[in-house]
Amino acid sequence: MTMTRRRRGQIGEAAAAALLADSGYRILERNYRCPLGEIDIVAAQGEEIVFIEVRTRSSQTFGTPQESVDGRKRLRLRRLAAYYLGSRGLAGRSCRFDVVAVWLDRQERVAGVEVIKGAF
C-alpha cells in the first residue's frame, strides 16, 4: 500500500469515527486485528454491535465507496465479526454491518461522509 493510499485511509477512518461518535455510536475498537484480518471500526449503538467498513475515495472512477464492498469482502467481514463476538464472549449478540463512505477533494480534505446503516 502506498503512503498516499495509507494516508487517504487514515483520513477517512478518522472522519468516519468522528461522525459515528457524534451520531451516538460508542466506538469500541479501531483497526481491530485478528488472525482472519482487520475490521476498520467496531462500535455499539444501543445494545447492538456494529461492524463498520470505511471506504475512502477521491473519485468515482472505480465506483462509489459502498460499491467496493463486494460479496467476497462481505463474507470476510461476517467471519471477522463472528470471531470478534466469540472472542469477547458476545456470541449471539445482535449485530449489523454498516459502511461509511468518505469522499475527499483534490487536496485530500474530507468533502463528504455518508453512513449506510445495515449495508449488508
UniProtKB/Swiss-Prot annotation:
GO molecular function terms noted in the UniProt entry: nucleic acid binding
Domain of life: Bacteria
InterPro entries: Restrct_endonuc-II-like, tRNA_endonuc-like_dom_sf, UPF0102_YraN-like
Assigned protein family: Belongs to the UPF0102 family.
HAMAP family: UPF0102
PANTHER family for this protein: UPF0102 PROTEIN YRAN (PTHR34039:SF1)
Name of the protein described by the UniProt record: UPF0102 protein Moth_0988
